Structures are given as structure tokens and as C-alpha cells.
UniProtKB/Swiss-Prot annotation:
It is found in: Cytoplasm. This is Probable chorismate pyruvate-lyase. GO terms for biological process: pyruvate biosynthetic process; ubiquinone biosynthetic process. Belongs to the UbiC family. Its main location: cytoplasm. One of its GO terms (cellular component) is cytosol. It comes from Bartonella tribocorum (strain CIP 105476 / IBS 506). Its EC number is 4.1.3.40.
Length: 169
């Protein structure tokens, strides 16, 4: 992607009033408080992270994400596709203020390691909230997490082949 304003994530509609109603099995996935990576891995024999973009961006490129993060000189952006048995399951976008990276430099060097492996093996991780959203018929979620009390924003869009939809088709 040549234009930094482009994202692998399409525009998402955030649902704050639970309308439309969220099926219970879908809600269970979207409200997962543990590692989504570990949950997804239970449904495949081959799990991969395909990196799409990793770079620093300025605040003006964040759009509405800026409302969820403190002002920073710049932000680390990581966009990936999580694959299960060679099928795209999830689009992930992580935005990390530079200050969060001070004690978490490894976040810039994950390569094909899932973000969840780093986050959920860290005893200094907390979650402020999970917002549920949609893009057409696809479900999404956005979480503000904190490492050592420093925020990062993770947005995940569950693609059609994702196991989230297995019992809902």
C-alpha cells in the first residue's frame, strides 16, 4: 500500500446500543478477554501471520482512532492478516503511541509472531474496553489495551472464513 491513509481495514460501524442484536456465539468470540491468537489456533493445524504494513505514522493518519489514544509525536502501526490453514481469518490493525514503546521495544520487531504471544505473556497487560462493530455482515472488535499502564489500540475484523462464523452459518 503506497498511501499511508489506506488501511487493510475497511470503514467499520461501531455498535454502542447492541442494535442489531448480537448472537450469543458471536458475542462470546467478540468479548474474548484472553488471547484471540490462542483461540483461533484451536481451529487449524497451520497458523500464520502475514504482515501487511509496519511503520511509524503521524496522528493525522489515525482518523477516529485518535480519540482513543493520547497525543504522541508518532505512532507505530502494524497491520496483519491472520491465516488459518492458508485461509484469511482476521485483519488486525494495532496503533501504538511512541511512549508505549519506551519499555516495549519488542512490539516493533514482532515479525511474523502474533501480537497476542507478546501481549498475553506479559503480566503488565490490562484491557480498558472492547467495542463491537460491523462491516456489512462481518463482525469486528476494538480494544484499548495497556502495557505497564501505557495504551495501545487493537482493531480486529473477522473475515468470512473465520471460525467465529462456524456455528452461525
Amino acid at each position: 500500500m503506497s498511501d499511508l491513509e489506506d488501511s487493510i481495514l475497511p470503514p467499520l460501524k461501531w455498535l454502542f446500543d447492541q442494535n442489531p442484536p448480537i448472537p450469543e456465539n458471536i458475542r462470546d468470540w467478540l468479548m474474548e478477554s484472553g488471547s484471540m491468537t490462542l483461540r483461533l489456533k484451536k481451529y487449524c493445524t497451520c497458523f500464520q501471520v502475514q504482515r501487511q504494513r509496519e511503520c511509524f505514522i503521524m496522528r493525522d493518519k489515525l482518523k477516529e482512532e485518535a480519540e482513543h489514544l493520547p497525543k504522541s509525536a508518532r505512532y507505530w502501526l502494524r497491520e496483519v492478516i491472520l491465516m488459518g490453514d492458508n485461509k484469511p481469518w482476521l485483519l488486525g490493525r494495532t496503533v501504538i503511541p511512541q511512549e508505549t514503546l519506551l519499555h516495549n521495544q519488542s512490539l516493533m520487531h514482532l515479525g511474523t509472531t502474533p501480537l497476542g504471544h507478546y501481549l498475553f505473556n506479559n503480566d503488565k497487560l490490562t484491557r480498558d474496553y472492547i467495542h463491537i462493530g460491523q462491516q456489512g455482515v462481518l463482525w469486528a472488535r476494538r480494544s484499548r489495551l495497556r502495557l505497564r499502564d501505557k495504551p495501545l489500540l487493537l482493531t480486529e475484523l473477522f473475515l468470512p472464513d473465520s471460525p467465529l462464523y462456524l456455528h452461525h452459518k
